[in-house]
Amino acid sequence: MLRFAPSPTGDMHTGNLRAAIFNYILAKQRGEKFLVRIEDTDMERNIEGKDKEILSLLNLFGMVWDELVYQSHNFPRHAQMAEYLLSQGRAFYCYCSKEFLDQKREEALAQKLPFRYHDAWAEIEKDSTQKPVIRLRGASEEICFKDEIKGIVSFKPHEVDSFVIVREDGIPTYNFACAIDDMLYDVSFIVRGEDHVSNTPKQMLIQRGVGYEKLLQYAHLPILLNEEGKKMSKRDNASSVKWLLEEGYLPQAIANYLILMGNKTPTEVFALKEAIEWFDITHVAKAPAKFDLDKLRFLNREHFKRLSEQDLAFLLDHKDPSVGGLAKLYLQESSTLNELRPKIDALFAPKIAQGEFASAMILLYPHLRAMIEEFSPALKDFEAFKKEAMERSGLKGKPFFKSLRLLLTGSENGPELSDLFEYARFFFNDIIRLKEPS
């Protein structure tokens, strides 16, 4: 089983979505189940409704989970495992106060030494009124694991000192709950961000402590950088999946980009289902990947081209596929839904006769309306339409073409008129409307 384990403490980060996608792909490739585990153990930071938002996003991106679990539901099992570790002498109660540990950290800092917890401190401040934490004893030997991206990763015993697995309030820490749940659900392969590399030896130590001998596979994804080459943070708009969607980027384009960046792929534009056929986690680069919004814009435009006219019309809140055809004509100048919508809205909005070609618009308008109301046969062919409109209005050349474009689109520039005509003719009664300035 592979798992995606988000915390409901904020908006989904693009790095988290990338990890979800990779886990989903690997589950499909390996014929294993895809588990979504909501890690809701941090009660103070949990935000109501964020779990539903996460699940909704996974659905939107086409990732259907086989199992769903809330980590807090497993608290009884976590407590049981902690008691077992205590009974075996592999864990112990620690009464150190925050103030005591902060002092020890300052002392280590003053000596320019890394802070390490010493087991001998455990009962220095023992008090009958003080609730202890539970710590797992640190490593006694080197801990190594193979990372499918980074290669062999090792930690010396002094790098994994005794650490807290259960807090004073009885709530398990992240590492403890994570390690036990991975064991309970028989997770076989863990793909996550490289900020979790230092958690891996602790989780391995926990599993060894309870007698779990299965060797898990790991792949830690390099961090994402912003366009300035710095680590992407919440201050970067593109770090939020919600922001990308609100800006009008398609889920399939976002997924395409997150798979593509820092990776060797046989093609540049693809769907998630296509990536399942050839994806190889070992081809992901070790180096951090820079988020390039221009590249995402390009991919978004390419995925618009892949959509049927009906599907694109639906995204633009229209039912007629011809609206999707109109929208595709604007892909040379538009890359997102937010850029396409104003173009389509302008087509269907009443036009205002103003500027250099205002008089030509006012002259041409009644003749076009007459052709519409008379169901002129010329409305079926652009050349015939152009010829009849010129004859009726007496306009020709630039005044004719500019005023016609303005009456159709509200803009002096845009796609070829002959291309626009093929789709716009079905909506001439709604499109060719003139509102004189008040």
UniProtKB/Swiss-Prot annotation:
<dbReference type="GO" id="GO:0006424">
    <property type="term" value="P:glutamyl-tRNA aminoacylation"/>
</dbReference>
<dbReference type="GO" id="GO:0005829">
    <property type="term" value="C:cytosol"/>
</dbReference>
<feature type="binding site">
    <location>
        <position position="234"/>
    </location>
    <ligand>
        <name>ATP</name>
    </ligand>
</feature>
<comment type="similarity">
    <text>Belongs to the class-I aminoacyl-tRNA synthetase family. Glutamate--tRNA ligase type 1 subfamily.</text>
</comment>
<keyword id="KW-0030">Aminoacyl-tRNA synthetase</keyword>
<keyword id="KW-0648">Protein biosynthesis</keyword>
<dbReference type="InterPro" id="IPR020751">
    <property type="entry name" value="aa-tRNA-synth_I_codon-bd_sub2"/>
</dbReference>
<dbReference type="GO" id="GO:0004818">
    <property type="term" value="F:glutamate-tRNA ligase activity"/>
</dbReference>
<keyword id="KW-0963">Cytoplasm</keyword>
<dbReference type="InterPro" id="IPR000924">
    <property type="entry name" value="Glu/Gln-tRNA-synth"/>
</dbReference>
<feature type="short sequence motif" description="'KMSKS' region">
    <location>
        <begin position="231"/>
        <end position="235"/>
    </location>
</feature>
<dbReference type="InterPro" id="IPR020058">
    <property type="entry name" value="Glu/Gln-tRNA-synth_Ib_cat-dom"/>
</dbReference>
<dbReference type="InterPro" id="IPR008925">
    <property type="entry name" value="aa_tRNA-synth_I_cd-bd_sf"/>
</dbReference>
<dbReference type="Pfam" id="PF00749">
    <property type="entry name" value="tRNA-synt_1c"/>
</dbReference>
<dbReference type="InterPro" id="IPR014729">
    <property type="entry name" value="Rossmann-like_a/b/a_fold"/>
</dbReference>
<keyword id="KW-0067">ATP-binding</keyword>
<dbReference type="InterPro" id="IPR004527">
    <property type="entry name" value="Glu-tRNA-ligase_bac/mito"/>
</dbReference>
<comment type="function">
    <text>Catalyzes the attachment of glutamate to tRNA(Glu) in a two-step reaction: glutamate is first activated by ATP to form Glu-AMP and then transferred to the acceptor end of tRNA(Glu).</text>
</comment>
<keyword id="KW-0436">Ligase</keyword>
<comment type="subunit">
    <text>Monomer.</text>
</comment>
<dbReference type="Pfam" id="PF19269">
    <property type="entry name" value="Anticodon_2"/>
</dbReference>
<dbReference type="InterPro" id="IPR049940">
    <property type="entry name" value="GluQ/Sye"/>
</dbReference>
<keyword id="KW-0547">Nucleotide-binding</keyword>
<feature type="short sequence motif" description="'HIGH' region">
    <location>
        <begin position="6"/>
        <end position="16"/>
    </location>
</feature>
<dbReference type="GO" id="GO:0000049">
    <property type="term" value="F:tRNA binding"/>
</dbReference>
<dbReference type="InterPro" id="IPR045462">
    <property type="entry name" value="aa-tRNA-synth_I_cd-bd"/>
</dbReference>
<dbReference type="GO" id="GO:0005524">
    <property type="term" value="F:ATP binding"/>
</dbReference>
<protein>
    <recommendedName>
        <fullName>Glutamate--tRNA ligase 2</fullName>
        <ecNumber>6.1.1.17</ecNumber>
    </recommendedName>
</protein>
